[in-house]
């Protein structure tokens, strides 16, 4: 398998987990608008 794809998938999973933790938390969300406003 291609290790680069695995790394990209791991990074995406980490971002999802960070988003789940951060975005409900107003100070974190305010510090990371790109993380939390990605749908817009």
Curated annotation (Swiss-Prot):
Gene Ontology MF, one: toxin activity
Location(s), subcellular: Secreted
Gene Ontology cellular-component terms listed: extracellular region; host cell postsynaptic membrane
Expression tissues: Expressed by the venom duct.
Location of region: Lacks the Ser-Xaa-Pro motif that is crucial for potent interaction with nAChR: 24-26
The keyword Secreted appears for this protein: yes
Keyword flag Metal-binding: no
Residues excised as propeptide: 1-19
Domain of life where this protein originates: Eukaryota
Keywords: Acetylcholine receptor inhibiting toxin, Disulfide bond, Ion channel impairing toxin, Neurotoxin, Postsynaptic neurotoxin, Secreted, Toxin
Disulfide bridge map: 22-28, 23-36
Record InterPro entries: Conotoxin_a-typ
Ranges annotated as spanning the membrane: none
Signal peptide: none
Domain notes: The cysteine framework is I (CC-C-C). Alpha4/7 pattern.
Family affiliation: Belongs to the conotoxin A superfamily.
Function: Alpha-conotoxins act on postsynaptic membranes, they bind to the nicotinic acetylcholine receptors (nAChR) and thus inhibit them. Has possibly a distinct nAChR binding mode from other alpha-conotoxins, due to a different three residue motif (lacks the Ser-Xaa-Pro motif).
Annotated protein name in UniProt: Alpha-conotoxin-like Qc1.1c
């Amino acid at each position: 398998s291609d290790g680069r794809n695995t790394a990209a998938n791991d990074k995406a999973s980490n971002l999802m987990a960070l988003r789940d933790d951060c975005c409900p938390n107003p100070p974190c969300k305010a510090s990371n608008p790109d993380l939390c406003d990605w749908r817009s």
